[in-house]
Each structure stands twice: as C-alpha cells, then as structure tokens.
Amino acid sequence: YSPAAAAAVVDASPLAEGRGEASLVRELERDTTAAGTYPIVLVSYSLACTTYEDPATAELVKAFLTYVASEEGQQQAAGAAGSAPISEEMRANVMEIVDSIS
C-alpha cells in the first residue's frame, strides 16, 4: 500500500454512467490486478452546484474547492486524516470542473 497506489486505482477506474458531465464519480475497480494500484480505498466526494444566482457565492465555492483539490489542501487532509492525496490527473479534472462554476 502507498498513497500513490490508492490514487492510482481511482484514476484507473471508469467514470460512473448516467451522471452529469460535471461528475467525477467513479465505479471503483476493486478487483483490479493492475500494477501499482491498491484497490481497497474509500473515496470522498465534494458536491457543488455548477451555477449560482449570487456570483459571490460562486466565487466562495470555487475558492473552497480549489483549496481542497490543491496540493496544500491534500497534504493537510493527509496529515489530519491519513488520507491519500489525489493524483495530478485527478486534480486537473477537478479544476476543469471548478473553473466552469459560475
């Protein structure tokens, strides 16, 4: 087990079907035999709207999610909860969605 192996199984798992295009929910492949993965993980999700009536609310949500996905935010979570930081690939996917919030 390593944090990178935990993040790798999430990256290697397909997106769940039937969800909106701003969803990164995964169907975790817990039976994977792919090298470098550790399939026993618990994934936490952050939920947000893609549009807000109040632009200030949208900016606050974007700032919060940007921090949560940032390297600093992930390191803080890892230290406090022992969680595995998300990969750079996942961070890029998250930020693409966060940047589209209005």
Question: Where in the sequence are the language-model features?
Answer:
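Flexible, solvent-exposed loop/hinge segments that line or gate ligand/substrate-binding clefts
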Residues: 1-71, 78-102
